[in-house]
Amino acid sequence: MTLKIDRSPRGAPAAPLQSLPYDSLGMDAESLKRGILGHLEYTLAELPQQVDSEWEPYVALALAVRDRMIERWVRTQETYYRRDAKRVYYLSLEYLMGRTLGNGLINMGLLDECTKALHELGYRLEDVREAEWDAGLGNGGLGRLAACFLDSMATLGYASYGYGLRYDYGIFHQRIVNGAQVEVPDGWLRYGNPWEIPRPGDRFRVQFFGGVRSSMDEQGRLVKEWVDTRDVLATPFDTPVPGYGTQTVNTLRLWAARAVEEFDLHDFNEGDYIGAIEARARSENICRVLYPSDSVAAGRELRLAQEYFFVSATLQDIIRRYKKRYRMFDEPRGARVFDHFADKVAIQLNDTHPALAVPELMRTLVDLEGLAWDEAWRITRATFGYTNHTVLPEALERWPVSLVGRMLPRHLEIIYEINRRLLDEVGGRFGPDDARARRMSLIDEAGGRRVRMANLAIVGSHSVNGVAELHTEILEREVFRDFHEMWPDRFNNKTNGITPRRWLLKSNPPLARLITETIGAGWVTNLEELRGLAAHASDAALGLAWRKAKRENKLRLAETIVRQYEHRGMALTVNPDSLFDVQVKRIHEYKRQLLNVLHVITLYNRLRDGHGSSIVARTVIFGGKAAPSYWMAKLIIRLINGVADTVNADPAARDRLTVVFLADYRVSLAEQIVPGAELSEQISTAGTEASGTGNMKFGLNGALTIGTMDGANVEMRQEVGDDNIFIFGLTAAEVAARRPHYVPGDVYRNEPSLARAVDMIGGGAFSPGEPDLFRPIVDSLLTGGDPFLVLADYASYMACQERVATTYRDESTWTRKSILNVAGMAKFSSDRTIRQYADEIWGVSPVRVE
């Protein structure tokens, strides 16, 4: 019996039609112009002279650019099949892609020609691209990291696919009304998405609920069958992901949920119009929003349904693609078919959301393909890698056993069997140790039985990585210590990175041009070349040009701030000569926006006390979303806006201190904020932030960092040098040592400026109509134990901010440090991170597409 390898591309007919020559559409302005006009007339049925908005030209341009991507896209897939490349499949519930047009033009080398083509048609590129909505596929750093990784995998030429869900409404659109966050649907798909291509021919059926039937096969083996299920269809939508300066165009495949039977004609004819579409609504709810609220039982069920729907459809697709290439014609199922699976397939789990892929692959191999358990487990473990993104215990997913058993009965059986074998292995390795067994078990028996998804991902993977050196140390030493003691070689670090194409070349053209003029353009694909800037850090001419570029970006950001506040019906003046002090990220207590607010209030009090001459003028910029059910984070947003209203209305603070909260923080807004920032606030409690990538984006754009020794800040300090970063606060070890004896009230009583600021918050100074509004924040700090040690780090933070102010007064010193920060970002490219994944986890090499 021989294994037959099918080397034809998917769906290729026996006698393929003659295809057009590659790049036949042309990459010049005239060809692009013809493409734009053609799509306006023949796709959109619009005459150019009748177009009266930017949407139609945007769509026509996007389709013209996509046409050129597709030529390379098809060639890329043909090359992967011909070369029999090992594929990498990146599974993430989030992809914070931002806008596709600008990034696509840069990566395809079409920016200048496209600008020229639009100009000849009477449009400006900067106007047309504003018509594009940010893709509503992510929330925070997890999704943005995934997007950077896709860019790097395509640029480096790895045969890779991103898999995710096609959310109808994303996370939410954030509005600020009377200082409070109001969530409204993010209708990013309301006008369609010109970049995606639906693939209804590749849809799969995903099962839920039902039961498990046991029987014996002809060989006397126990066979399990999942029966009486409620099914949903998964339909894929593909988006091309072009690499920079290469012929490679990879794929992001997103699943949409559809009902098996979308419309019940009998119910409709009986007058039950709602019931007629009930199945459709129930199915489509799976992909309605990212992270439905888990504060109610229905929300928890929907979240679990999302996660399983995602991994089931994805694994069916991966196995379909594999079996097309490696299959026995005389034995369509069995172990031999999957002999090469782990050699040709690498699956990376981005956090625990896709962890159900472990029991799902086991179910597929054992129940559907007839493999023995041990062989299936060997393949499963050799296929998966797991990336952890948190050290916070409450953020490690755990699902009620009762819920898993009801929705996924066969998977719970498989999880139980994996757990039984795991605990036997633990006992054989360490002897009788009930405490260790309880900690390592896949089932948490305390406070209601729950499935520990992180433990499941660790046990089912051959690699477990953290995303910063400190983060990985904490995982090995504390969070997953038992697993590290059992499998030390399984754990490794892969410090996060960002793509310099989006976060410098695209978002900051003035600085990108200046860097290229100074050291050449090689940094775009080899960030190590930024180190060459260090030799020019004291050059006066470069310093002058550097400040000019920063001021240009500050003016652009100031315009954005004023425009957004005008849209909210508020007048605001921004001093472009002030220090732009920025903290934009998800609103969470551990990220300590509260510490920043306390500093702002302290500065405000100094101004009111007549000490304005000693204070460097600042514009303090906040941004970020709070989870809809996270009431404390939402209260912090109200506090920030309350402080902003008070400070900005006081003549004592005019031109000296301005406080801003930019609503609906997203990638396209970040591309305006990051280049204009001068001080980057990375002030989480040490030992709580896994890595962070915002710190890298700001550093790459010349902002100096004020931060704790947390996450990637530790490595940034090593790269830029102690003199070029502002470090304060307790270390992770000091935090752990202090917690058991920490009395926040003592700090409050011993720091008069702190006590004054806290009392103002609790006394209604920033909520005059509701004096007790912010009392819960004060209670959390003073009587709730101050869990993230905000008060403990206050004095150190204030002293560090004084050092910031002193340095900022000396513009040449600040500029030199800014240049050295950019030079020090050489390590933090997602290209470097992806190479490490490829070499050390996935075992893949680049595939050159001609």
Task: Give the positions of each predicted feature.
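A conserved ligand/cofactor-binding region detector
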Residues: T2-E850
